Amino acid sequence: MITYDLKGKTALVTGGASGIGFATATVLAKAGAAVAINHLADDPRGPEAVAKLHAMTGARVISAPGNVGDAADGPRMVEQAVADLGRLDYLVNNAGTPATRTTIAPHELDRLTEEVWHTLLQVNLLGVFRCAKAAAPALRAARGAVVSTASIAGINHAGSSMAYGATKAGVISLTKNLARGLSPEVRVNAVAPGAVDSTWMIEWTNEQRASSIDNALLKRRCTPEDIAEVIVFLLAGAAMVTGQTIVVDGGLTT
């Protein structure tokens, strides 16, 4: 893994209490950055993650409770995190949801309710826009960077539902347009993970678990750390990369 010296830098990681978010926060903190971990206000994993990461790294780690899927709470959370950190160099839009615990196949249209669509759009797509918009002044001042978590479901893979895939395709499109809108001061990119070992796989069938390995060229699933490595590269390195989505799936979609 490439290492960076991020002393004096700050980062806000949404959905940072577990999985890809916590792995990314860990890499940033180990490199010396001060990190704000966003989590839902009633999620006990948030304060636990903050305490754990501070103990692991000695870095400044703060809690940033709030719901990115809420039109008022999301921007409020970002503004408070920026105020607490004093500046903002990096925004990681990682918070997301599948909205359902089980896969909704393309032919199961009746299961794709308005409620499912609303939840997915509010969190996965509008949440990304809200956070980027709220963070834009601070990011411009710092000449910072944004990385959002998309998915191979937004490109050419089934994902948990067609609605989930549509929101992730939206993140990919939004990434290009935010890169235009925030240039030249801020770089904006995305990662599109494939199958990742995480709590999202709890409801997967044995067949789904096996196929996610068998169909990948590298014959393993991604770990949260695999994705975090690319996210931090896009934040702290990759000085001439913007508006791009990097697929990290071990060759699953190749």
Task: Please identify what each model-predicted range represents.
Residues D43-P44, P65-V78, E114, E225-D226:
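The beta1-alpha1 cofactor-binding region of Rossmann-like NAD(H)/NADP(H)-dependent oxidoreductases
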Residues T10, A17-G19:
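Conserved glycine-rich cofactor-binding loop
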Residues A132, T167, T175:
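Active-site helix of classical SDR
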Residues D89, D110-F129, V147, V171, ...:
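Catalytic Tyr-X3-Lys loop
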Residues A132, A138-R140, S183, R220-V248, ...:
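C-terminal substrate-recognition "lid" of short-chain dehydrogenase/reductases
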Residues S151:
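Residue(s) in the substrate-gating loop at a strand-loop-helix junction
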Residues A33-E48:
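Conserved glycine-rich Rossmann-like NAD(P)H-binding loop of the short-chain dehydrogenase/reductase
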Residues T102-H118, M201, S212:
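Substrate-binding pocket helix/loop in short-chain dehydrogenase/reductase
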